[in-house]
Amino acid sequence: IVSIMDSVRILKTDISVTNINEVSEVLINEKKIYTAICNANTLVRCYKDENLNKIINSFSIKCPDGFPVAKASKILYKNNQERVDGYKLFLETIKAGLNKKTTHYFYGNNELTTKKMIEKLEKLYPGINILGYYCPPFLDSEQLLEREHVDDLLDKKPDIIWVSLG
């Protein structure tokens, strides 16, 4: 996986210099783009955990979610970085993908929240193409990747897999 955008280093993490529209367009038009939504908590956790930092830094896009991250980018690197709000990015990408019939799969969260979210998305965006979802119980990282759930996800071949585990 290669970073596809310019980035700046904040603490130990490389944060993409981007905006909501640019990220949404990449997510809709490119395949296998790993994207992290990074707020201040993410950066602190990455600073303390070298393995987590290595994983996040390997992603193609690391969005500056949260005012402190965007502001740090502006101050430290004299750029015009704006906040790339994860929720707004999610909605913009859903909306932008309607014309292209982009398919979505949701992984994480809990059953009740996910069903309510899907219901709301179907009202807001008629024609949204949701292939499925899986809400794992609290498990260790190896259990999260149990073969049956991975196979289900791979069989459906969604264009975008939205992951919410934290």
Place the predicted regions along the sequence by residue.
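N-terminal nucleotide/polyanion-binding subdomain common to many enzyme families
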Residues: S3-K88
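Proline-aspartate-enriched helix->loop->beta-strand connector
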Residues: L153, K157-G166
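Charged active-site motifs of nucleotide-sugar-dependent glycosyltransferases
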Residues: K31-I33, T102-T103, D159
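Conserved acidic residues
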Residues: S60, L131, D159
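Generic short amphipathic/hydrophobic targeting helices enriched at N-termini
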Residues: I1-I4, K156
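Conserved beta-alpha
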Residues: A70, K74-D152, K156
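Short beta-strand segments
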Residues: I37-N39, Y107-G108, S164
